[in-house]
């Protein structure tokens, strides 16, 4: 054990440093990649802190273990609530929404349509639509399953769309975003519901200040939507995690993340096209005036994202 002490001390110190980086970058709102980048991987950095703390406990390096425990306690104020459901599942008219990034239109359209059909999806919010992929979805039967849509597909995969089993009205594309984000209304029998499919740019390779600006624009859009009495649902590839201050700033004015509301915890959704598991949870469904029942991550064949299927309750 004595021989292991120097190694454990070094690893423990590195773990402590990793945790400190995670905590600091998650707490500050600085639109620079040196801050935003590490925050994206905060859960992984905190796992390093846990391992380092355990090693230091084993070799009795108490001060490193104690400091690591303090860092983890601070991080826990953000992480632990993600695993605790807000309340009992809400009563109301049940609806199922799927959120899917289709990777520049490279996802398998037939598999996506089958997933929508098998899961009884009422609304699909999709990002990275191309004109060819929209046509391929129709050929695969999407128009039979979700016959109504408001979609703005673009060559290269910059598009977005909302598909629905009931008519879609008042569709518009949000101004000022490099990648398309759209909104429209649907009525599932309880009155109009505003739905968004959003896609802020990533903080890299896009300049991080542009990402920060688009997140601020989205915050303003959601604040405006909160002024309306109608329920609102936002499905999107936010290119942001709960460790980003800009994402948490969206969760005000009555907004909640469905995964957070049902206690789903940290759900990595990207990337899925590598030899290792997805590392970051950047796909989310936000709601206001809508109850949340469940949230499940699902595979999107051919995409580099996992999708989300959420069960909601319209009050």
Describe every region a protein language model picked out.
Residues 1-2, 190:
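Intrinsic structural disorder
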Residues 2-139:
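N-terminal, active-site-proximal structural segment of metallo-dependent hydrolase catalytic domains
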Residues 97, 103-117, 126-315:
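Soluble catalytic domains of enzymes that build or remodel membrane lipids, polysaccharides, and related
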């Amino acid at each position: 054990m004595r021989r292991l002490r120097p190694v454990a001390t070094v690893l423990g110190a590195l773990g402590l440093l990793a945790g400190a980086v995670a905590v600091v970058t998650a707490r500050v709102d600085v639109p620079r990649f040196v801050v935003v980048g590490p925050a994206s991987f905060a859960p992984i950095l905190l796992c390093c802190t846990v391992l380092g703390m355990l090693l230091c406990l084993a070799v009795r390096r108490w001060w490193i273990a104690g400091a690591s425990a303090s860092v983890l306690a601070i991080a826990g104020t953000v992480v632990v609530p993600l695993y605790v459901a807000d309340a009992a599942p809400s009563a109301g008219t049940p609806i199922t929404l799927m959120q899917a990034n289709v990777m520049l239109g490279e996802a398998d359209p037939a598999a996506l349509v089958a997933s929508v059909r098998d899961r009884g999806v009422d609304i699909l919010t999709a990002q990275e639509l191309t004109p060819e992929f929209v046509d391929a979805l129709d050929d695969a039967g999407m128009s039979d399953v979700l016959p109504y849509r408001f979609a703005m597909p673009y060559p290269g995969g910059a598009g977005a769309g909302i598909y629905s089993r009931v008519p879609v009205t008042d569709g518009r594309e949000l101004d000022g975003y490099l990648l398309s984000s759209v909104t429209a209304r649907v009525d599932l029998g309880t009155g109009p519901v505003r739905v968004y499919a959003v896609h802020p740019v990533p903080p890299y390779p896009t300049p991080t200040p542009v990402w920060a600006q688009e997140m601020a624009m989205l915050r303003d859009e959601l604040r405006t939507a909160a002024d309306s009495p109608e329920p609102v649902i936002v499905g999107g590839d936010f290119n942001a995690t709960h460790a980003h201050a800009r994402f948490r700033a969206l969760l005000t004015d009555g907004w909640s993340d469905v995964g957070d509301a049902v206690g789903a915890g940290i759900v990595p959704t990207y990337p899925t096209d590598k030899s290792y598991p997805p590392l970051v949870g950047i796909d989310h469904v936000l709601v206001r005036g809508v109850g949340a029942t469940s949230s499940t991550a699902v595979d999107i064949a051919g995409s580099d994202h996992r999708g989300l299927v959420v069960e909601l309750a319209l009050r």
